[in-house]
Swiss-Prot record:
Pfam families: Med31. The gene is soh1. This is Mediator of RNA polymerase II transcription subunit 31. Belongs to the Mediator complex subunit 31 family. It comes from the Eukaryota. Component of the Mediator complex, a coactivator involved in the regulated transcription of nearly all RNA polymerase II-dependent genes. Mediator functions as a bridge to convey information from gene-specific regulatory proteins to the basal RNA polymerase II transcription machinery. Mediator is recruited to promoters by direct interactions with regulatory proteins and serves as a scaffold for the assembly of a functional preinitiation complex with RNA polymerase II and the general transcription factors. It comes from Neurospora crassa (strain ATCC 24698 / 74-OR23-1A / CBS 708.71 / DSM 1257 / FGSC 987).
């Protein structure tokens, strides 16, 4: 098996086994495919990283687009529970399925808007989770 996730037809691959499943996953650079894909999918929660991917023309590469489609398994159990920030991560993963978004994310204005929305959501969550007692 090649270590490059885009070197094979991602849509035909099964998601990696989650930790504790007893599966003996091969390691790539010391990490399992589960760990590598988790790290990558979590990076998609960062609008600046999405802009970087767009600037490198990856978001117009059919193999990369197929890989993004394959990664949607992270939105379902049992994988969902491993994502640290599921809100922005899964929102961006869903948006990346749309060609218009993949084209528009090159815009610094969109990146900034997504960044500010993410910060606002984090602040709102904190206020709701830890209301002041004053």
């Amino acid at each position: 098996m090649a270590s490059d996730p885009m070197s094979v037809n991602s849509s035909a691959r099964e998601p990696p086994a989650p930790p504790g499943s007893g599966a003996d996953e091969p390691k790539y650079g010391g990490y399992t495919r589960f760990e590598l894909e988790l790290e990558f999918v979590q990076a998609l929660g960062n609008p600046l990283y999405l802009n970087h991917l767009a600037s490198r023309k990856l978001l117009s590469n059919p193999a990369f687009i197929a890989y993004l489609d394959y990664l949607q398994y992270w939105s379902r159990p049992p994988y969902l529970k491993y994502i640290t920030y599921p809100g922005p991560t899964l929102k961006n993963l869903e948006l990346l399925q749309q060609e218009k978004f993949r084209q528009d994310i090159i815009s610094p204005d969109l990146v900034e808007r997504l960044r500010l929305e993410g910060m606002k959501a984090g602040i709102d969550w904190h206020r709701e989770s830890f209301p002041s007692t004053a």
